[in-house]
């Protein structure tokens, strides 16, 4: 008889669940099955060749990074455009293996030639529109090249002629400096001048009432009469100064003339003896019947010399 106290054998306990590790390495490598190590690619590798999408960050060296996919419609560029988009001044080029190599001159020339606007790319302006516009312009203005050349030559000749005329004008006319406008000079008639001169001889200065009466009688303005008298007084003063200078010169010339007395006279004793004896007495050596004048500024007087 089986023992009632014995219990049937229990099932073995289930195995404990695997412990989840929260290390950064395990989080980065989230996929439990380890894939075969891939060959390292460049940091920025165009993923369009493999996946048909935009750029993706891939593994570099031994470190692995999560791949951030960029949708293709937002950033879809071909490999050719990416190669051309490299900065021209950057002296290194990225190789597929991720190594930096210096660019050669041939590579720089090719990049510059590709980036020049003369290179035929898909982004160039459409030629059919320009051709159509040129055709319409030719239809509107149908001129041959010869006519265009003739028109240009005519315009150049006109410019040359105009330049020559301007040069002649500059030569003929002296440099005009900005000067104040000259006042017009009043022209007096003979009768007016005669009346003014007669009034000036009588009176050098006129009062305001006399000036007003004279101006009314001569049909002139008071300002004209006043200016005429001022000019006439200046002229009169210049004449007086000239006359005074001439008088001074004549007076100075008269002062230079000096009177020289007679040097020899007849002897009084000889005259008396000659009168008593009746014979002619001795004549003086020099006799001057009239006084002689000498012009000498320094000689003032000469003493009278008598014979011994």
UniProtKB/Swiss-Prot annotation:
This is Homeobox protein HMX3. It comes from Gallus gallus. SMART domains: HOX (SM00389). The keyword Cell inner membrane does not apply. One of its GO terms (biological process) is regulation of transcription by RNA polymerase II. Residues 181-240 bind DNA. Residues 9-19 have a biased composition (Pro residues). Induction: Regulated by DAN in inner ear. Belongs to the HMX homeobox family.
